[in-house]
Amino acid sequence: KATIKPQSVKDVFVRMLTLYAGMADVLAQTGDKSLQPALDSIWNNIVDMRMHITGGLGAIHGIEGFGPEYVLPNKDAYNETCAAVGNVMFNYRMFLTKKDARYVDVAEVALYNNVLAGVNLDGNKFFYVNPLEADARNAFNQGLKGRSPWFGTACCPSNIARLIPQIPGMMYAHTDNDIYCTFYAGTSTVVPLSDGKVTIKQTTNYPFDESVRF
């Protein structure tokens, strides 16, 4: 019952984002509209008052939690990689409930600017913490000045490994009669609609080139 009427987000961001994503799943699967006002309130509070420009979430180090509204520091931001993963998952599920592009816009921001920044190109070193400002002198990343090959609490590497393989399955969504492109990437797929199957091919070098061709 405590989840039905929240006005703002509190507590540990990863735990809360997982709860909110689950609420959105319940709404999408059951059509329980009693959850919608709470989810809308939560989403607006996060995006309007607590999200960094990178899609990162969480200003409080000690509890790995959401800070006060509009407290969005650069150097001292926490922005845990797990929270960015949760931001993608929550917003994708919100999109499935409403088919509103603003949700996948936020998911895209978090994916490109926070999730993917949490791992190096070789895939073997990680950020736990993602501040917006780093000077190579402050050991901001769990005692390190840069990415780490592992952590004592290794939730972030495993959450990246959990999300990335799901992205191909999140590229498109559909109803009986409508197809939605949720992320831009070079892809091809076959979408089953009520009147038959539709083959889609998307050609793009996004985000390095904003040209997208279907």
Listing of model-derived features with the role each one plays in the protein:
Residues 1-214:
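Glycan-recognition and catalytic cores of secretory/periplasmic carbohydrate-active enzymes
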